[in-house]
């Protein structure tokens, strides 16, 4: 296996046995690809902006003498880059410019004669852009648009499973769901009549819709029924016989022909009888006249002579009708063939309940149902019906919908019109009737073939189209308003509705969410999340059990483990590792093709529908070296069921053992040994881990760590290979390899690192270089670690030495006992950065002012502010300290203009102002690490703002100069090369200043050309530098675009260092969570024979009942990994020769049962081996992939290699007494996370504070600095105890007795601890409520 440069530094021992056929795909592609489709120019106009424009344009005026046509669009460059947008609090977006053509036709001339054409580029608002990491910056905060799983458009056949009607009868229904437009439902009622609903309104008989499409009763019966023909001859009634139709009936007369009786009266007709009748080709039999009575006529029968209607279609024949028909000379009579078994008379029955009888009455009925209360006219009724399903503006099935529709009806072609045709509606009705007749199955709504993914691009396109449609109406009116000659396209289009629609979607849609940025994993998971909620989706309350449940089709598409606990369980899912969406938006997953018993490396992506037809072997099936199945019978999946199949039947095989789970779950080692509920908690809690000060790679991982860290975008990754030319804390410079540069560039890549920035969750984002000067790097190598990464691997927590044993009740109820060493070594110390903002507004009494001159505030309080009234950087502040001094004018009187003028001239400033400074919230303390001042254009900047500006300019200048210096050095090196090749001596050159080199002439013409080219580049470089500097300077010095009425915003960033303490929540990766109960001195912790104390003591009772045994296996393997590291460390300390080291490390990598990983240390140089050993001495990291991990034997071998007991248990001694514990204890290394539920954020206690306005009771909650509620049950408790005085003070002075509490406070201050309870305010509220009901209550004074 080839390792990149960073990977060579620390290779993870892999226990996986199955070869990796397919690399893990780029994990954010679902977001990036979808948005790319939205903004890229699509020549076919199938998706994205192009499709939206083409669907709305051209817009014609009502008169038809002008139209506005769409030509093309382009996206401009964003004004600010991503970082600037985040700092300034603006949206990262690009202007959309659309080229439109206004065509004006001659009014009098023949049609289509063009009078004038005007083309113009029109601005149509801003389109938010996606950053490289799949997020959007909206108003300065990073947001993610979550993909939605919704019901695919198409037609669905379903039943109520007997739940609607009390009899338990199963009622079937069909629903046509378009992408946009009205829903059309057909449903049976308990009497077996077929009804139709439009948009879930009241139901109408289904035949109304057929009549509205101009079908007569006769046409309808022809469509839905087979006929039976009777002939009247010689006073006998003959019936045309189709033997198959008699199956299962009882003969009501002798069936005879040619004098032979085939079935006697009263006998049941069996298959044998039918075969006999078919064999002898009996086509007509005589039936008794009574047999026809009750049959239904298939068409109208008219008396030719008189023109009167004897019998209308769909009427029952009685014997006298038969006589009249015979008299009128009708010799053949067609009746409908129905039976109770498989040819129900549903449509015939429905026609009887249908009140309409022609097209107009049907249209009127539909109109009345859709628009009750409006008088129907013929035109309005016709328009309404046409627009419902047959108009492309109002109805669209979409390509997906048409494909699903045609598949559902068993048609061959996949493409077709986006609107419904009459045949479509009739075929749906026919299929529904077939299902009611027992032919065909209903659909499974939760099958992933019936649910599709709607990603960012598609939702943004829909929103954009909504905006365009709003504009369309306005344009139509403008086009009709006369003077077109003076108008340009620009005057027609108002960009406001478009940008409003887009802004609303990105800013406040339910699926546009504030990005979860706790750590890299939470970012990635959030972007791969799939929600069934949101507009056009389900609601939490309505979603039943079935929708939330795991479905067989989730396999390899949606993770069965990772979903939130609580009301959203099963509605919010995570995409599986290898899943992707196909062109229609259905999820598909990769499989290896199996041909002639051999598994090939060819890979097919199958959607849920396609997968149902194949037999698919599992990823852990045993194969021989040629890829043939070893066992005769293989465990396979077919049609959602798992069972054994012979190896010849297998058609596909899973790609990887990880393909079932999501990224979050694939990071849990030994997942296969954990109970599902705990695995769910484990996957969810990894997302809440706070990045620690120094990341520590997990000793026991799964091999997915690198993919997650790199794909998440928190690390700096080399775009091109080269050598490290310069590195410091904030930038890395790479001299690019010659073969990767393109002609005429300096070949330098500069990576600026993010330093101590605030994330959405107030955690700290900081990048640190992990390469050193002169190191070679390749494309894709990790150059710098971000938060929670270690050498380019995800590192959410720390490897802790744990012991499973009780310890004096301190691990009761999952509590955790922690050693003081953990605090001393800062293992779980985290940095949290808070942003506090102070806004100075223009009030109607005058502007608020930011100043250090605050009334009634002492010197001490102002000691940390500079002269502008803003806190210094580096100041340590605590709750209540002033960060930004601000005063607000409080005027009783509004000033007259004269007074304002006098004030302005004489500057009487000290008039009424009140202190409204920004203070540090209660319970927060920290260090000020950054201050930013934003000033409105035209407002004078204060001293501090100018200082900040200057320092920013200095930084930028320094950066750009450094960049220029590096580029220059690169260029001059090439110039020197050309000059020396041209025959100039090196030492002469070096005596000349570099600028003079360019003036030298060379004899060789080709070399001279090269030199001139390089000189040109040098000039370009300098010009570019000047341009860049000027642009940056302009950006920094220009005023900021602030909200209306805001003059200044000052943002202060506080960094808080949080050490671990009792009350913090910690967890492992297996759902084993707990709260720290005590931090114990090192000397009191249990220790082993060598005197090494453990770091954490966990409760062994937390394991058996929860069935997450993965944590125990992880502990054992962690112990072995650490033991091997210790041995390597000892060898390094003894300075043994490299050969021995190489041999030992090689032995460790080769250990285990046929691992897929082949590490060949012979290809490593001694230097590389030493560096590897240096990185392994703290423990050899291992990978046990999900469902393909280390086995018990392998863990034992590892323990043996590390010279540790294979039981994984060791003897411990009590740190307090030095006595040995009575039995060996499981000790090992477990990866523990500190979760973002810190006691500092939760703990609070109220002394005095704010009160509710009406009831005058204290508020509740930490944010309001509220008290603890003493509710009615608590009152009962005090009553039960008879604690009268306690109860009295709870209900009065401690709550809402306003006078009593003020007096009480005074008394306590005076040292007098007495209370005089008065009237609680809530009693007055009660009185007022009773009086408002018109009952007067008066309180009598005693």
Curated annotation (Swiss-Prot):
Keyword Transcription carried by entry: yes
InterPro entries, sorted: DNA-dir_RNA_pol_bsu_ext_1_sf, DNA-dir_RNA_pol_bsu_external_1, DNA-dir_RNA_pol_su2, DNA-dir_RNAP_su2_dom, DNA-dir_RNAP_su2_hyb_sf, RNA_pol_bsu_bac, RNA_pol_bsu_CS, RNA_pol_bsu_protrusion
CDD domains listed in its UniProt record: RNA_pol_B_RPB2
Class of enzymatic activity (EC top level): transferase
GO CC annotation terms, alphabetical: DNA-directed RNA polymerase complex
HAMAP family, A to Z: RNApol_bact_RpoB
Subunit structure: The RNAP catalytic core consists of 2 alpha, 1 beta, 1 beta' and 1 omega subunit. When a sigma factor is associated with the core the holoenzyme is formed, which can initiate transcription.
Job of this protein: DNA-dependent RNA polymerase catalyzes the transcription of DNA into RNA using the four ribonucleoside triphosphates as substrates.
Protein's UniProt name: DNA-directed RNA polymerase subunit beta
Native organism: Proteus mirabilis (strain HI4320)
High-level lineage: Bacteria, Pseudomonadati, Pseudomonadota, Gammaproteobacteria, Enterobacterales
């Amino acid at each position: 296996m080839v390792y990149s440069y960073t990977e060579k530094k620390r290779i993870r021992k892999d226990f996986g046995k199955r070869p990796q056929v397919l690399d893990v795909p780029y994990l954010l592609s679902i977001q990036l690809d979808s948005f790319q489709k939205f903004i890229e120019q699509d020549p076919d106009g199938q998706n994205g902006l192009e499709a939206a424009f083409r669907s709305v344009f051209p817009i014609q005026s009502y008169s038809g003498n002008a139209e506005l046509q769409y030509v093309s669009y382009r996206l401009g460059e964003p004004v600010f880059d991503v970082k600037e947008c985040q700092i300034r609090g603006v949206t990262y977006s690009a202007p959309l410019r659309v080229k439109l053509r206004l065509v004006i036709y001659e009014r009098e001339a023949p049609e289509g004669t063009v009078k004038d054409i005007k083309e113009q580029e029109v601005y149509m608002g801003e389109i938010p852009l996606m950053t490289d990491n799949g997020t959007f910056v909206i108003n300065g905060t990073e947001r993610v648009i979550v993909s939605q799983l919704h019901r695919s458009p198409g037609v669905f056949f379903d039943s109520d499973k007997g739940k609607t009607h009390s009899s338990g009868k199963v009622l079937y229904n069909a629903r046509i769901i378009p992408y946009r437009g009205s829903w059309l439902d057909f449903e049976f009622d308990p009497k077996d009549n077929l009804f139709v609903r439009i948009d879930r309104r009241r139901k109408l008989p289904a035949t109304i819709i057929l009549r509205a499409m101009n079908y007569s009763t006769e046409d309808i019966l022809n469509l839905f029924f087979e006929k039976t023909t009777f002939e009247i001859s010689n006073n006998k009634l003959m019936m045309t016989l189709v033997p198959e139709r008699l199956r299962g009936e009882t003969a009501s007369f002798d069936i005879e022909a040619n004098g032979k009786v085939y079935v006697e009266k009263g006998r049941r007709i069996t298959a044998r009888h039918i075969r006999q009748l078919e064999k002898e080709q009996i086509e007509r039999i005589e039936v008794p006249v009574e047999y026809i009575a009750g049959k239904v006529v298939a068409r109208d029968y008219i008396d030719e002579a008189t023109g009167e209607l004897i019998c209308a279609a769909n009427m029952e024949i009685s014997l006298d009708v038969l006589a009249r028909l015979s008299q009128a000379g009708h010799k053949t009579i067609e009746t409908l063939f129905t039976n109770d078994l498989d040819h129900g008379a549903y449509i015939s029955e429905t026609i009887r309940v249908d009140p309409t009888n022609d097209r107009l009455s049907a249209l009127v009925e539909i109109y009345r149902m859709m628009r009750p209360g409006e008088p129907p006219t013929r035109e309005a009724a016709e328009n309404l019906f046409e627009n419902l399903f047959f108009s492309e503006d109002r109805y669209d099935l979409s390509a997906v919908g048409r494909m699903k529709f045609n598949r559902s009806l068993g048609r061959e072609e996949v493409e077709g019109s986006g609107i419904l045709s009459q045949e479509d509606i009739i075929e749906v009705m026919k299929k529904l009737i077939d299902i009611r007749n027992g032919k065909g199955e209903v659909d499974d709504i939760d099958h992933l073939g019936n649910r599709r993914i709607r990603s960012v691009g598609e939702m943004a396109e829909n929103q954009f189209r909504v905006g365009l449609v709003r504009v369309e109406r306005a344009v139509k009116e403008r086009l009709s308003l006369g003077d077109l000659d003076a108008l340009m396209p620009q005057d027609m289009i108002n960009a406001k509705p478009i940008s409003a629609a887009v802004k609303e979607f990105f800013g406040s849609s339910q699926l546009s969410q504030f990005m979860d940025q706790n750590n890299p994993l939470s970012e990635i998971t959030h972007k791969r999340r799939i929600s069934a909620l949101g507009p056009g989706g389900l609601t939490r309350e309505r979603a039943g059990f079935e929708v939330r449940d795991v479905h067989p089709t989730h396999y390899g598409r949606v993770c069965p483990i990772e979903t939130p606990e609580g009301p959203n369980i099963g509605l919010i899912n995570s995409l599986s590792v290898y899943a992707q969406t196909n062109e229609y938006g259905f999820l598909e997953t990769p499989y290896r093709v199996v041909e002639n018993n051999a598994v090939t490396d060819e890979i097919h992506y199958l959607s849920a529908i396609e997968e149902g037809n194949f037999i698919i072997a599992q990823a852990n099936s045993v194969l021989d070296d040629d890829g043939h199945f070893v066992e005769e019978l293989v465990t396979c999946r077919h049609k959602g069921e798992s069972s054994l199949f012979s190896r010849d039947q297998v058609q596909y095989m899973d790609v990887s053992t990880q393909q079932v789970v999501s990224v979050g779950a694939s990071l849990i080692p030994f997942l296969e040994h954990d109970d599902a509920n705990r695995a769910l908690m484990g996957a969810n809690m990894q997302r809440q881990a706070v990045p620690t000060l120094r990341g520590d790679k997990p000793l026991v991982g799964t091999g997915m760590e690198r993919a997650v860290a790199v794909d998440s975008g928190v690390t700096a990754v080399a775009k091109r290979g080269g050598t490290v030319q310069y590195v410091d804390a904030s930038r890395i410079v790479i001299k690019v390899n010659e073969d990767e540069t393109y002609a005429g560039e300096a070949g330098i890549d500069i990576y600026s690192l993010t330093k101590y920035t605030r994330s959405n969750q107030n955690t700290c984002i900081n990048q640190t270089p992990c390469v050193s000067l002169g190191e070679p790097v390749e494309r894709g190598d990790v150059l710098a670690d971000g938060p929670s990464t270690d050498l380019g691997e995800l590192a959410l927590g720390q490897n802790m030495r744990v012991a499973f044993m009780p310890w004096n009740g301190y691990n009761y109820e999952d509590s955790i006992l922690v050693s003081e060493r953990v605090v001393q070594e800062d293992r779980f110390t985290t940095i949290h950065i808070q942003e506090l903002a102070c806004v100075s507004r223009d009030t109607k009494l005058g502007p608020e002012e930011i100043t250090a001159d605050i009334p009634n505030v002492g010197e001490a309080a102002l000691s940390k502010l500079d002269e502008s009234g803003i806190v210094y950087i580096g100041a340590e502040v605590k709750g209540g300290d002033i960060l930004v001094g601000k005063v607000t004018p409080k005027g009783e009187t509004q000033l007259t203009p004269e007074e304002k003028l006098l004030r302005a001239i004489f500057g009487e400033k000290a008039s009424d102002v009140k202190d409204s400074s920004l203070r540090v919230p209660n319970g927060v303390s920290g260090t000020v690490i950054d201050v930013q001042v934003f000033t409105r254009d035209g407002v004078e900047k204060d001293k501090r703002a100018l200082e900040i500006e200057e320092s920013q300019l200095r930084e930028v200048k320094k950066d750009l100069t450094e960049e220029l210096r590096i580029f220059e050095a690169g260029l001059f090196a090439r110039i020197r090369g050309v000059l020396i090749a041209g025959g100039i001596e090196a030492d002469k050159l070096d005596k000349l200043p570099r600028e003079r080199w360019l003036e030298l002439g060379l004899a060789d013409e080709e070399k001279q050309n090269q030199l001139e080219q390089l000189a040109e580049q040098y000039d370009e470089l300098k010009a570019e530098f000047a341009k860049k500097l000027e642009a940056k300077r302009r950006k920094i010095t220009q005023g900021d675009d602030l909200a209306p009425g805001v003059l200044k915003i000052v943002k202060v960033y506080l960094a808080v260092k949080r050490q671990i303490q009792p009350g913090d929540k910690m967890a492992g990766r297996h759902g084993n969570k707990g709260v720290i109960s005590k931090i114990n001195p090192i000397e009191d912790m249990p220790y082993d024979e060598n005197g090494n104390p453990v770091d954490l003591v966990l409760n062994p009772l937390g394991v058996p009942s929860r069935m997450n045994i993965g944590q125990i296996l992880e502990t054992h393997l962690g112990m072995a990994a650490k033991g091997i590291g210790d041995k390597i460390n000892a060898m390094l300390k003894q300075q043994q020769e490299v050969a021995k080291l190489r041999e030992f490390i090689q032995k460790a990598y080769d250990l285990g049962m046929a691992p897929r990983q082949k590490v060949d240390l012979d290809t490593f140089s001694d230097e590389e081996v030493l560096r590897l050993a240096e990185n392994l001495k703290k423990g050899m990291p291992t990978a046990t992939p999900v469902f393909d991990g280390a086995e018990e034997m392998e863990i034992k071998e590892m323990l043996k290699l590390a010279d540790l007991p294979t039981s994984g248990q060791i003897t411990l001694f009590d740190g307090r007494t030095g006595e040995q514990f009575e039995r060996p204890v499981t000790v090992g290394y477990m990866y523990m996370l500190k979760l973002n539920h810190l006691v500092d954020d939760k703990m609070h206690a109220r002394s005095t504070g704010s009160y509710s306005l009406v009831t005058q009771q204290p508020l509740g909650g930490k944010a309001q600095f509220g008290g603890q509620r003493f509710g009615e049950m608590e009152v009962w408790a005090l009553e039960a105890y008879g604690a009268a005085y306690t109860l009295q003070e709870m209900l009065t002075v401690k709550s809402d007795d306003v006078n009593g509490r003020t007096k009480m406070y005074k008394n306590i201050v005076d040292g007098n601890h007495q209370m005089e309870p008065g009237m609680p305010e809530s009693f007055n509220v009660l009185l007022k409520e009773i009086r408002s009901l018109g009952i007067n209550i008066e309180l009598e004074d005693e």
